[in-house]
Curated annotation (Swiss-Prot):
Pathway: Amino-acid biosynthesis; L-tryptophan biosynthesis; L-tryptophan from chorismate: step 4/5. Its EC number is 4.1.1.48. PANTHER family: INDOLE-3-GLYCEROL-PHOSPHATE SYNTHASE (PTHR22854:SF2), TRYPTOPHAN BIOSYNTHESIS PROTEIN (PTHR22854). It comes from Arthrobacter sp. (strain FB24). This is Indole-3-glycerol phosphate synthase. Belongs to the TrpC family. GO terms for biological process: L-tryptophan biosynthetic process.
Length: 272
């Protein structure tokens, strides 16, 4: 069993426990009553033909399987406000509890604190989680191609669109990019971390980004340690970067996001 397989199995067990407390029918009622989803596609520059600005998806993450504890984050809402003030286009909130110490309570607190689009960051293995995300006010969900069959990827993508949300469709190989494109993904992430082994290879992004249709929003995931990595991703075709560890471990995340945005814009300007 790979690391990803193990995480997915845990995510399914935890989801089933929640389903015993809150039925799918109840979630659908809550989703129907929720405020309309914010346009994460537009927030990430999807409708901007120039795409001269690098967008930052700033992540709230207490721990990770590869690094262990990262930050205690006693008040995720306060951190989210700092992210928003720094110019984050989207805020990602981990809700997976076993490996990342996240929760839907964290997500709810952040949702009340900021108006920017939110990514409910979890390991989606069932449509229940998609309805759950919308019921809690999510605007964007994560679909990992390696975790899903083609039918699941297609069906989950369609349900996400029907609920007014967008999906960040995560890939790590050329074959997974082909599958994402076949599922009409509009926001495609390239994770330079292999979730089956947790190894990081930053060169993966440059080798794969050229295979993503130009109309898609291209997100570089993992491996951002500082502005040099941001410049590298932006120069290699990224429209956005997803950053977690480098922000939660920084005493001034607001300033760091502004630095990343500026560095990315410079790199984008140099490539065109």
């Amino acid at each position: 069993m790979t690391v990803l397989d193990d995480i997915n199995a845990g995510a399914r067990e935890d989801m089933e426990a929640r389903r015993r407390l809150v039925s799918l029918a109840e979630l659908k009622d809550r989703a129907a009553a929720a405020a309309p989803a914010r346009d994460a596609w537009a927030a990430l520059g999807g409708d901007d033909s120039t795409r001269k600005q690098l967008k930052v998806i700033a992540e709230i993450k207490r721990r990770s399987p590869s690094k262990g504890d990262l930050a205690s984050i006693a008040d995720p809402a306060e951190l989210a406000v700092q992210y928003a003030d720094g110019g984050a286009s989207v805020i990602s909130v981990l809700t997976e509890q076993r490996r990342f110490s996240g929760s839907l309570a964290d997500f709810d607190a952040v949702r009340k604190a900021v108006d920017v689009p939110l990514l409910r960051k979890d390991f989606t293995v069932d449509e229940y989680q998609i309805w759950e995300a919308r019921a809690h006010g999510a605007d964007l969900i994560l679909l990992i191609v390696a975790s899903l069959t083609d039918a699941e990827l297609r069906d989950f993508s369609q349900l996400t669109r029907e609920l007014g949300m967008n999906a960040l469709v995560e890939t790590h190989t050329a074959e997974e990019i082909e599958r994402a494109v076949a599922a009409d993904a509009r926001i495609i992430g390239v994770n330079v971390r292999n979730l089956k082994t947790l190894d990081v290879d930053r060169s993966v992004f440059a080798s794969l980004s050229g295979g993503i249709p130009p109309e898609a929003v291209i997100v570089a995931e993992s491996g951002v340690r500082g502005v040099d990595d941001v410049r590298h991703y932006a120069a290699s075709g990224a429209n956005a970067v997803l950053v977690g560890e480098a922000l939660v471990s920084d005493a001034t995340p607001r300033e760091r996001i502004a630095e990343f945005t500026a560095a990315g814009a410079e790199a984008i300007a140099a490539r065109v």
